[in-house]
Amino acid sequence: MIRMALKPLVAACLLASLSTAPQAAPSPYSTLVVFGDSLSDAGQFPDPAGPAGSTSRFTNRVGPTYQNGSGEIFGPTAPMLLGNQLGIAPGDLAASTSPVNAQQGIADGNNWAVGGYRTDQIYDSITAANGSLIERDNTLLRSRDGYLVDRARQGLGADPNALYYITGGGNDFLQGRILNDVQAQQAAGRLVDSVQALQQAGARYIVVWLLPDLGLTPATFGGPLQPFASQLSGTFNAELTAQLSQAGANVIPLNIPLLLKEGMANPASFGLAADQNLIGTCFSGNGCTMNPTYGINGSTPDPSKLLFNDSVHPTITGQRLIADYTYSLLSAPWELTLLPEMAHGTLRAYQDELRSQWQADWENWQNVGQWRGFVGGGGQRLDFDSQDSAASGDGNGYNLTLGGSYRIDEAWRAGVAAGFYRQKLEAGAKDSDYRMNSYMASAFVQYQENRWWADAALTGGYLDYDDLKRKFALGGGERSEKGDTNGHLWAFSARLGYDIAQQADSPWHLSPFVSADYARVEVDGYSEKGASATALDYDDQKRSSKRLGAGLQGKYAFGSDTQLFAEYAHEREYEDDTQDLTMSLNSLPGNRFTLEGYTPQDHLNRVSLGFSQKLAPELSLRGGYNWRKGEDDTQQSVSLALSLDF
């Protein structure tokens, strides 16, 4: 009875510990499936020193006392924190084969990592019958078929929409299975075998840890085994990355050894104590020297200030650092695939500016053989709502547009225009900052006769992304990665309409029309500056837009000097596939991977309102407001322009 009463309390405590990591809006993965060892174990083993019904994890307890028997559970491991950030169902983040959960009737989760597992056992937990074994003191507590065997029994392969997550290799060292370079390479190969088994079964996204430098852990630091452990860790990782680059799988590698070195070199940036020996001491004192200040029995117990809980396992702070690191890589394309959308948004604002000018001139062209020039300025705002694989963003900017047209005869005129646009976008949970300058030029032609009218424009542009700053949480701090790149665009647009008004000099005009638009934006690939564990290199991005639309435009003249005009159009986008972005860590250039990002809107509504006021016989003032709305995007712009006949 007591055990059953405490079960909800234990679950609530664990959920509370997870909730400290804010859940992000994008949620591109159906679930998170984890394989590995104690670094990822979500609670396969019972916790005899914890609350009834609790399970053990290889990190510190949540506090405030951190002591065994205190009623405090163990904190979450990195994949549990990551899953919470990705919006994965909490039950999916639980252990796969926990005897405690089975006894209590709690459904098994998707975390198959087991403390103590070697690379061969990790492979079995994926591929073997009875491959998931929970044993303590040579006693089998529970067994299950491996993940793929269990899925096959249900007629399923690997979930192609899931994120897979693998750690391993440390126990091959700790259990004496790696004593030389050849054995280190063989262990790395076994981990790659696990990756390939998942890939061949249909897995599309697989996160793989590089092994931490075992020479930089309390277990070996400062002792005679430190150089040996560091050397073999390096051999393992070199073989792992080499084989992964040839495995044919889409692998997101985590450069954990580099990340931890950065944390040790600048601990304050990660919220760690800068005045403590973070490698030679630990929190619990289990197999290592307890930190005298922040250790469990120190003067001020606080595991958040330390990297290691025991001789080889991170504190919750270390686990959160790794979760944030992984999330920063997975979320990068959610923001970076918005760069082409900044350009598309700017192009649409520029085209709206031209169309507003044309609408003000409708049935009111300059005389044959005469020029009409215009110059205008304005501002625009572009808002993106979050999607499954795209971040929310808020953009704003300003512009200068100028151009002119020449009337060839009664029915035709042609012209040119140019525009400069400055755009800024803040995106993601930490308001990453992306800035772009656009330089565009157009040639256009217009026709109006016998109530029919048409226009067509060809536009080209140069894009200067001069300040790109990706920001993200990292442990107890925040980091940004900077870069810059260029791009270009070209577009063609055309409209055809029929004026319902029977006379050209009618005070009102109303016209249905159809439209066709094509645009292509290309953003050059670039590398973020530096070679930190979080810096990325991105491939080129290309995003085309093909739209057909129909609408209604009208205008009304109040006398000979003042007119109001308006337009509504609905457009269908035919290039609406989710965008992919291929990238790699700067520190691991040979291991490229591809992730999903922004999905273009398949339907758009557009409204424009404006006025034109004649100031002198050859001089007019025009103002306008434009609004575009898709399912997840909103774009608005305002403008003011002068036109002069000469």
Swiss-Prot record:
Compartments (UniProt record): Cell outer membrane
Any further remark recorded for this protein: Overexpression of EstA results in an increased production of rhamnolipids. Rhamnolipid production is strongly influenced by the C/N ratio of the environment. At a C/N ratio of 83.2, a modified P.aeruginosa strain capable of overexpressing the estA gene can produce up to 3.9 times more rhamnolipids than the wild-type strain.
Gene name, Swiss-Prot/TrEMBL: estA
Protein name: Esterase EstA
GO CC terms in record: cell outer membrane
Enzyme class: hydrolase
Domain Autotransporter: from-to ranges: 366-646
Source taxonomy: Bacteria, Pseudomonadati, Pseudomonadota, Gammaproteobacteria, Pseudomonadales
Active-site residues from the entry: S38 (nucleophile), D310, H313
Physiological role: Esterase whose enzymatic activity is required for rhamnolipid production, all kinds of cell motility (swimming, swarming, and twitching), and biofilm formation; the exact role of EstA in these processes is unclear. In vitro, has pronounced esterase activities towards p-nitrophenyl esters of short acyl chain length (C4-C6) and Tween detergents. Also shows relatively high activity towards beta-naphthyl butyrate, whereas its activities towards triacylglycerols and acyls-CoA are negligible.
Topology, Periplasmic side: 409-410, 448-451, 501-507, 559-561, 616-618
Entry keyword Hydrolase: yes
Keywords of the record: Cell outer membrane, Hydrolase, Membrane, Serine esterase, Signal, Transmembrane, Transmembrane beta strand
Pfam family, one: Autotransporter
Transmembrane segments: 398-408, 411-421, 438-447, 452-461, 489-500, 508-518, 548-558, 562-571, 606-615, 619-628, 637-646
This enzyme's EC code(s): 3.1.1.1
Protein family (similarity comment): Belongs to the 'GDSL' lipolytic enzyme family.
Source organism per UniProt: Pseudomonas aeruginosa (strain ATCC 15692 / DSM 22644 / CIP 104116 / JCM 14847 / LMG 12228 / 1C / PRS 101 / PAO1)
Recorded topology in the membrane: Multi-pass membrane protein
Signal peptide: 1-24
Family annotation (NCBIfam families): esterase_EstP (NF041609)
